[in-house]
């Protein structure tokens, strides 16, 4: 498993990182009501001041299961899952780029994990994230 704190230090050590992150705090949702990304969402706004306070980061935790062989229903199905974390403080067009993605782990094939298995896979990841809950100082570029 990739260590989140080391990935975060590397992620934040880019020459334009502060300018890119500042863009999210300057973002104003459009008056049209059309949502283009998470920053336009009423649900995001309902999370309170933590997500809108400068230098606080918001991450998206994502698991995507896929068939290793194909997506055809008639063929053999072997399910595997990628566990990823994205920084939502980046402009939308950069959030999901591979270089900005923390690859947290993978669920083992051939079946989707049970509740017990997924808990065992996610617990170490959550423990790494808990370290940052009350804030940590990480130097940028």
Segment roles from a protein language model:
Residues 1-141:
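Domain-level cores of phosphate- or acyl-group-handling catalytic modules
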